[in-house]
Amino acid sequence: MDIPRIHTISESAHRIHNPFTPEKLATLGAALRMHPGTCVLDLGCGSGEMLCTWARDFGITGTGIDMSPLFTEQAKVRAEELGVADQVTFIHGDAAGYVAEEKVGVAACVGATWIGGGVAGTIELLARSLDPGGIILIGEPYWRQLPPTEEAARACLAGAIADFLLLPELLASFGHLGYDVVEMVLADQDSWDRYEAAKWLTMRRWLEENPDDDMAKEVRANLSSEPVRYATYTREYLGWGVFALMKQ
């Protein structure tokens, strides 16, 4: 069980697999006003930076699930580095359908809502693990401005313009699902750069070390095209944020 290899190559040096900086992750943690001992479930946890740093900074405990063996191992190493291995647990597995054995105070899916077939299904899944009065965290893209054409939307790596909403529409959609939006922290172009541009040096170094790998041609093509594609489309049109929700 793994995610596509191009992602584990291009993001192998990432600690945060979303367009967030460490500062934004810390801002989100502080905004949630979690008490020490709050239990957090993170579905699609990547390399575990959210759980590990929040365990260090806010005293939370938690469990993270991710499909990538590489990222799961990185998460365990990071927990040891930060001295929080006794507070957080990381499991290599499919987060789709995962429900915690004991209810949690915060249930999160930050940038992987495909596990529930979209935002609504992911919220429904997370709610099954949540304490009454708990908080759901959803990380999701939105359009900063509507792409002018469907081709431009696809160049943002969306399937179509209809895949994402404008920010006011996305916020309204949570209300339609019966949830109050109680906090949000949004990516900006600088944090997008840290997510996307960091891939380029990683790919270049990987190519130098693996010139004969079966993936070398695809990685080279990505390295050649991604900077211009990203600057032209994703950076201009696509937003991303983490939204804190509570049942109405």
Briefly describe each language-model feature range.
Residues P141-I161:
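Short, glycine-/aromatic-enriched active-site segment of Class I SAM-dependent methyltransferases
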Residues G105-V119:
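A short SAM/SAH-binding and catalytic strip from SAM-dependent methyltransferases
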Residues E183-Q248:
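Conserved Class I S-adenosyl-L-methionine
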Residues A120-I135:
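A short glycine-rich, Lys/Arg-flanked "PGG" loop and its adjoining helix->strand segment in the class I
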Residues E49-A96:
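Class I SAM-dependent methyltransferase SAM/SAH-binding core
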Residues G97-A107:
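A short acidic, Gly/Pro-enriched loop at the edge of an enzyme's catalytic core
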Residues T38-G46:
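Conserved class I S-adenosyl-L-methionine
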Residues N18-P36:
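Conserved alpha-helix/loop element of class I SAM-dependent methyltransferases that forms part
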